[in-house]
């Protein structure tokens, strides 16, 4: 009876295993797991549709086709359970065993498994040390392999061609044995003694002379070690029998019309069985060798096709000429098992409809159409109807719901009460793309969405659709309410600023009501209280924007301790009514633009908490909509005021362009310089017109009551929209009322002729034609961008998915030092913004008093940030994810604040995925190459000079300079800086100075704000002389190292250095002492080598002064600002690719000297004060940016080019690399105005740096050049040190995100990412065990993820009610769902 009830048991919970192992199957294992041998290729009988015996669908092997019924029909029903029918041999059991029972095919001859043969590197080839080509010759019966050399001196597994074999037989008198095909290879593999081979290979590695040999031996050793450790035998890579997949997994479905649809696998199996049976028959008949060989080769090919069709030779195609899908194809790619069914499951019941705006909803609500709610909540409604006694059976409940009786609607209202639903808008780029709301029933068929959550969903109401999902179990409802409710997601996880912020109309309304209007009705009145203002406004006595004074009770004036009288406007007092108590009036007593609203909500969240913020957000929404309606703002043609000075600016620009054209014609400048200057002139003209236009728009002139003309802030509609941040930008307005400006070609170059018209004037045909260029490119880019951005996010998620907060404090003493971010002397990001929400590493002390401002290990919150900024601290040491010592995962202290919640991060938070989403989500806003606005090119006029911003003394930092004739300092080195120091000695500004710049002020001279500090030519890289003297050319031979280039337009020529074939020729300019009587008497006092492409600026024998330009290297004509910008740049950084022309950097500090050229490369020698000098070879023609006797620091580039991240890591270490990567990625996002917190980028960089490469083995079991996880290496070292051995030494490795994902320790995660076959092949050989630590593996295995509420420590918690009365109000979910995970109650860890 027990046994009978077990039949109705629920399926078992998938939680009872803790790891999964993969390995190579032995023939015995295959046979042991099989339920019988498949002998015939037949499938089912075409008349009876019953499976053929011993065929591919045989019921005897795989189980009955119908539940509890044997094939011949003798035994039916449950009572015969477990009996084996004596007539047809079928066991009477449920038919679902046909999904799990394997069969097998015994092969007449062994065949090689194609994965181990062809998946590079070939594992069989590696073990036997045979090349893949030779191996294939043996396997496909074109050559022999020696299987037993006896004492002939031949090598084991030596490959012999047919002729060579026959010769050898005669030579060695038939003393050895050789064979063909997989059988021979199997014998060779069987003969391998792994221990002995491993020993031998280790020895070979020690003795290896060449690097290549060592690498090859290391690879072989790796394979041998893998087999040794895992207990797999090499000969198992050759199959003697093949497992047959259960028939339900390769179904045969009858279509109408008597045809069948079948899985490709059946065809593939059928070919194998046919060929196998034919081979058996031929062997029994003792057919000629050549026929048998051919049949064996065909069997090998059939098995290859079954395992991986198309891997070798042409893919076998089915009747419709389409390649058949093999077992490997079932796993691979987007439509394979991993990504289609295991990672991307579909939900079985959800709704979807168009969205419309629901302005009267509260923030936690969404409007759900009644029809949809009825369908989604069906089971709950049936349950309630039965409970209420309206119906007695489910069937009658169903009828009642179908008829939509009034009782049903009442029950529905009750069921949906406090039952959250989840709304999702595709594409879900970050976690805010799915949020929970409480449904409100509405008529109609569209879902209503709250306007404030649109930003998070990136939704608009032009026909977007959204999906509705219903959490069923109590636990999932709790999680939806506590973690996913829209009211709990006010802050963005990417940057910690509010994401629930009024936009568009709401912003406009609030902006309008907080503006001041001069001389409005009631201007200058004084009120006793805010309430009085409300009364006056309602009575129509004062205007909304009138400037008034009000006595505020809760604000005391500093002087008299009395309630202060505040100057404000009527609108701001009205806005104050919706403000929570704790938020000060000063935060809205200003013109509220969108930026101010973000700050307001932020301040409210910090001061008043979540609940008040939600209420405030809703009230702002209502107020905003109301007042934008009252404002009645619209736009018309006349709002676009074209500035009067426009034509004058354009005329003067045209004149300048003519002037430059003349200079070019006279040969004073090159074509490239001309192009750049022209572009600059127009860029500047556009800016000037835009500036004039904006000044015009932003000011109105009105008559004051006493008849004076007064300029006041404008109420121009277009200006208000842009100024408030509601819609539009300065650039768009510029195109409407200024001039459209320069356009770019699709290639990114800028077209010289700008569009001088604007949209209000209208474009002529030529201008319109030029416009289409940029506009079309924009559309093409958008399409490409979406796919690229999605792929970047996928790679990021994959690499970071196992970065989870696993402990509170790892106890590290290491961290990063953070300073303010400056660019060109401007502070782009204050130190406060960068350290907010991080944890201090050491005590932060006040530099003046020495008091502790922030104790070590404390989170730096808003108040502490203010304290640090006020104290003027410039460098702060903080804990960082990069230096976290946690072995698996990350600790909470190193991560700091959970940006979306505003407090230190919780245990189990999946910070890796959050980081990946935060970086990937704005990816679609990044550009593919260049940044356009409707195709107009934006390029800043190149900076050519530096102006001081403050008054102070000039200080040179690390500058070598010579003073030229005019008395200016000419900078002769790179990386020098100029600072301006105020009276107290503090640095007010600091600027990097380029080589060749003219500094107008000497050290310690005083500058005034606005004075020019330095100037330079941005378009050429000068080569300067440091000494005065006569010019002599060396190796500058026309036609060999130099050519005179004639400019067709100007008819003038210039001398340009070209690449010479003669390696000994090194074009140079020598400066000879001009005074023959002096000590140096005509000898060389300066020598300058010229790179390819340099233009010589001096004539031979002319006289030059110190600081003069002797040659110029033209810079590339500038494309739009960013060489590889946008998305490709971010991908390049995260993939850690070497840049195309990367700069060689020095690894040590020292003095530069030039050595003799070697192999056509220049030799640069860096000599340190102590120790060996280092030599660097630099390709000819590359410009060397250091000079003889310059002092360089480690990590400085010796030539032009971009930095190679691998070099930075090697030379400067992890922290510098992290700083470089974070800054570079941030720069791309900053250009687009996207905010991302540094810690997200750090998290990804940590994942890229998690492996090390072994340099010295010590006494460990590691191999040299082995790459492994850092913590595995640390554990191994600890083990060895504990025993008193020598630890191994390793260097950190920087892997790109794709590489890092593929090298995770979890083979399931790696296989589901890319290169599935390769990953699984390697894992099988190593007998890998997946401990299921990351998120992805657990999703694939169908378990809860080990993050958040799924952490193992919450797994076995039981929910226990304390008092009886607690039990009543909880809505009971239908039992069918609730008992799914009996021992797996989750508790929200929010209370933690």
Curated annotation (Swiss-Prot):
Binding-site residues for Zn(2+) 1, renumbered to this chain: 70, 72, 85, 88
GO cellular component: DNA-directed RNA polymerase complex
Reaction(s) this enzyme catalyzes, per UniProt: RNA(n) + a ribonucleoside 5'-triphosphate = RNA(n+1) + diphosphate
Cofactor binding note of this UniProt entry: Binds 1 Mg(2+) ion per subunit. Binds 2 Zn(2+) ions per subunit.
SMART domains: RPOLA_N
Residues reported in the UniProt entry to bind Mg(2+): 460, 462, 464
BP GO annotations: DNA-templated transcription
Binding site for Zn(2+) 2: 810, 884, 891, 894
Presence of keyword Lyase: no
Enzyme Commission identifier(s): 2.7.7.6
InterPro entries assigned to the protein according to its UniProt record, in alphabetical order: DNA-dir_RpoC_beta_prime, DNA-dir_RpoC_beta_prime_bact, RNA_pol_asu, RNA_pol_N, RNA_pol_Rpb1_1, RNA_pol_Rpb1_3, RNA_pol_Rpb1_3_sf, RNA_pol_Rpb1_4
Known cofactor(s): Mg(2+); Zn(2+)
One example GO MF annotation: DNA-directed RNA polymerase activity
Keyword Zinc among record annotations: yes
Keywords on record: DNA-directed RNA polymerase, Magnesium, Metal-binding, Nucleotidyltransferase, Transcription, Transferase, Zinc
One Pfam family hit: RNA_pol_Rpb1_5
The organism's place on the tree of life at top rank: Bacteria
Protein family according to the UniProt entry: Belongs to the RNA polymerase beta' chain family.
Subunit structure as annotated in this protein's UniProt entry: The RNAP catalytic core consists of 2 alpha, 1 beta, 1 beta' and 1 omega subunit. When a sigma factor is associated with the core the holoenzyme is formed, which can initiate transcription.
Its biological purpose: DNA-dependent RNA polymerase catalyzes the transcription of DNA into RNA using the four ribonucleoside triphosphates as substrates.
Protein name: DNA-directed RNA polymerase subunit beta'
Encoding gene, per UniProt annotation: rpoC
